[in-house]
Design a protein with these regions (language model features):
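A short linear-motif detector with a strong N-terminal bias
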Residues: 66-68, 93-94
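Acidic, serine/threonine/proline-rich low-complexity intrinsically disordered regions
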Residues: 53-67
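Short glycine/serine- and small hydrophobic-enriched flexible loop segments
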Residues: 49-56, 115-119
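Extended glycan-interaction surfaces of carbohydrate-active proteins
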Residues: 1-45, 74-140
């Protein structure tokens, strides 16, 4: 259910779209933004815990790595080039096109992304190398 309700290419939603309190967009007045902050907003740093769980729960580590790396490709390509310029935003809207918001550069988002990428590289080096080569092709 996490994969279908919470996972996005930019992180995990803080609330399921099925919940009555879900807010898909982080916008409006400061009060409106504050009320949306934990009501569906996507947090990139949660990808670390998600990746840890995949590796723990699945026997097939290459499949876990393929799933996570394939999911987060937009975060590791277009977002890093176009918005964060080498960094990761604090939060994203919970609905496509997953507009970045909050702080332009969030240290714990960057740290968790780097940590889980390193963990995936160790768990499935072949999968990681192919994904990395794909990223290089995309940026050319």
């Amino acid at each position: 259910r996490v994969r279908t309700l919470l996972l996005t290419p930019y992180g995990l939603r803080t609330l399921s779209p099925a919940d009555a309190n879900y807010r898909s967009l982080y916008e409006g007045s400061p009060e409106e933004r504050d009320s949306a902050y934990h009501q569906g907003t996507v947090w990139p740093w949660l990808l670390g815990a998600y990746g840890d769980t995949l590796l723990f729960a699945l026997w097939d580590r290459p499949a876990a790595a393929r799933h996570l790396l394939g999911t987060i490709t937009p975060l590791c390509t277009a977002h890093l080039r176009e918005y964060g310029v080498g960094s990761v935003a604090e939060i994203f809207d919970a609905a496509p096109p997953y507009r970045p918001n909050g702080a332009v550069a969030q240290a714990w988002s960057v740290a968790e992304l780097l940590r889980v990428l390193k963990k995936m590289r160790r768990a499935a080096p072949g999968v990681y190398r192919r994904w990395e080569a794909h990223l290089r092709e995309e940026t050319m």
